[in-house]
From Swiss-Prot:
Belongs to the glycosyl hydrolase 22 family. It is an enzyme of class 3 (hydrolase). InterPro entries: Glyco_hydro_22, Glyco_hydro_22_lys, Lysozyme-like_dom_sf. This is Sperm acrosome-associated protein 5. Residues 22-150 form the C-type lysozyme domain. The lineage of its organism: Eukaryota, Metazoa, Chordata, Craniata, Vertebrata. GO terms for molecular function: lysozyme activity. It holds the Pfam family Lys. Its EC number is 3.2.1.17. Keywords: Disulfide bond, Glycosidase, Hydrolase, Secreted, Signal. GO terms for biological process: fusion of sperm to egg plasma membrane involved in single fertilization. Disulfide bonds join 27-147, 51-135, 85-100, 96-114. The active site is at 56.
Length: 159
């Protein structure tokens, strides 16, 4: 009986989250990331963040992916439940001190705060496999084409 209660609460939470979710348009997300201070943060430009978010979630704040190890990835940046947030299921370090379900809505400042913490580590954006595979070392100017902003990048990261 307790298991059914957990299922009902989880489904109700997911339904509420879905109502408040958002799939961002590229330039809309670029402006949001710039306002949040990610343009040039730790040497990465908004193009880096857009590229990574595109390959992680398709700019979908409600995207959840499940891993073979039992952990899950949440939100626009696909933050992992074993390390960065608590989903109530996976044993976690919860290094961003947050509930994973808080990453599934249109309000992405908490996602950005956690992503800033991750990128501040020695791995930088390399912590995301998608950034290493699809974004690192590539011309990212296409990600900002048609958006009203200027690229700030660190030449040490993007030679």
């Amino acid at each position: 009986m307790k298991a059914w209660g957990t299922v009902v609460v989880t489904l109700a939470t997911l339904m509420v989250v879905t109502v408040d979710a958002k799939i961002y348009e590229r330039c809309e997300l670029a402006a949001r990331l710039e306002r949040a201070g990610l343009n040039g943060y730790k040497g990465y430009g908004v193009g880096d963040w857009l590229c990574m978010a595109h390959y992680e979630s398709g700019f979908d704040t409600a995207f959840v992916d499940h891993n073979p190890d039992g952990s899950s990835e949440y939100g626009i940046f696909q933050l992992n439940s074993a390390w960065w947030c608590d989903n109530g299921i996976t044993p976690t370090k919860n290094l961003c001190h947050m509930d994973c379900h808080d990453l599934l809505n249109r309000h992405i400042l908490d996602d950005i705060r956690c992503a800033k913490q991750i990128v501040s580590s020695q791995n930088g954006l390399s912590a995301w496999t998608s950034w290493r595979l699809h974004c690192s070392g590539h011309d990212l100017s296409e990600w900002l084409k048609g958006c009203d902003m200027h690229v700030k990048i660190d030449p040490k990261i993007h030679p």
